[in-house]
């Protein structure tokens, strides 16, 4: 019984395990991402993506086969929203910035992300609850392999969550 209690407590302890300076940085970027999520061009891109739906036949396994320089991949980084987030990602404290629609599908990105859809990932699930979120641990970013803390913020329209902006916050 005591072991069970320790195991139940341990995830909460892990969530508070970031060094204070890094935790402050993460909180700063959660606020910044909430501002970015409210950018009218980002909101418009997500609304359009939600109305249009995902790329026909695209899945995460097919996305892995898409070359980073292909027109399909480049469409996400060179769109109006893609160019905006590429500009924001020039901030070297983040190593990736991605916009997702209401189903977790890719809308725009600063670089080709590993996944086309991340609807089952905590970075998406938690922001879809309507509040900025950040992981409580440091791990290599799945796309960039840079040590990061994953963070996200909801994209809102009329009080409804319509998508997510997420980033890898560089830890070094």
Language-model regions: role of each:
Residues 8-14:
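Sec/Tat signal peptide C-region and signal peptidase I cleavage site
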Residues 14-69, 91-93, 133:
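Juxtamembrane extracytoplasmic/periplasmic/luminal helical "stalk" adjacent to the first N-terminal
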Residues 167-172:
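Helix-start (N-cap) segments at beta->loop->alpha junctions
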Residues 145-154:
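A short beta-strand signature within small-molecule sensing/ligand-binding domains used
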Residues 141, 155-157:
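Sensor-regulatory modules in signal-transduction proteins
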């Amino acid at each position: 019984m005591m072991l069970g209690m320790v195991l139940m407590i341990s995830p909460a302890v892990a969530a508070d395990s970031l060094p204070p300076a890094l935790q402050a940085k993460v909180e700063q970027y959660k606020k910044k991402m909430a501002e970015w999520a409210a950018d009218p061009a980002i909101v418009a891109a997500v609304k359009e993506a939600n109305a249009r739906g995902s790329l026909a036949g695209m899945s995460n396994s097919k996305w892995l086969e898409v070359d980073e320089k292909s027109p399909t991949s480049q469409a996400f980084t060179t769109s109006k929203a893609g160019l905006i987030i590429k500009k924001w990602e020039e901030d070297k404290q983040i190593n990736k910035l991605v916009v997702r629609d209401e189903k977790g599908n890719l809308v725009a990105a600063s670089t080709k992300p590993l996944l086309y859809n991340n609807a089952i990932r905590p970075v998406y699930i938690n922001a879809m609850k309507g509040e900025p979120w950040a992981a409580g641990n440091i791990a290599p970013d799945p796309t960039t392999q840079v040590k990061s803390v994953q963070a996200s913020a909801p994209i809102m329209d009329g009080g409804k969550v319509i998508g997510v902006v997420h980033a890898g916050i560089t830890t070094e």
